[in-house]
Amino acid sequence: MNFLSIFVLIPLLMLAGLWAAQGIKAIRGVMVTGASALLIASVVLTFMYLGERSAGNTAEMLFRADTLWYAPLHISYSVGVDGISVAMLLLSAIIVFTGTFASWRLQPLTKEYFLWFTFLSIGVFGFFISIDLFTMFMFYEVALIPMYLLIGVWGSGRKEYLSLIHISEPTRLQ
């Protein structure tokens, strides 16, 4: 398994832990543990990337891995990072970590909120590590569903309207 796949595996383990968690303390414990692991992994990745670059590695994508999923259509799970994606992974991990604590006192449907928040993080992290168009689009679509629900259920103001606008904006033709 490639190191980059950890950024998808940790949120998947968080989902399993949240699914089994009973009580608010267990839910918060799973979220803090997972968010901390993501933040640590992103800091480690940043230092690994900077170490590779300072050692003279000039490859376009570092830590690349390709796994063929469906041969007739040449669909594969292709991941790798460049400088921008490393920075975006680090920023996303910081946002997941701080978002966990910002939602600390959320009471209605706490478990469901954190399940969708974690599902969103799978899509975001997967999007930033993907280097194949199919993989990128798959993770982008994974992120859209939780984003719609997080805005529509836990948002404020005209949340239903805004969630529809946010989801339909990338596909709207003008």
Kindly give the residue locations of the regions a language model identified.
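Short "domain-exit" segments at the C-terminal end of structured domains
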Residues: 169-174
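Hydrophobic positions within alpha-helical membrane elements
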Residues: 16, 87-88, 137, 146
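Hydrophobic, membrane-inserted alpha-helices
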Residues: 11-15, 96-97, 119-124
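Hydrophobic transmembrane alpha-helices
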Residues: 14-18, 98, 148, 152
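Short conserved micro-motifs on helix faces and helix-strand junctions that flank
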Residues: 8, 79-80, 93, 129, ...
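Alpha-helical multi-pass transmembrane bundles of energy-transducing inner-membrane proteins
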Residues: 24-26, 116-119, 123-168
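C-terminal regulatory domains involved in ligand/effector binding and gene-expression control
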Residues: 3-10
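Transmembrane helix-loop-helix hairpins at membrane boundaries of multipass inner-membrane proteins
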Residues: 2-3, 18-101, 105-115
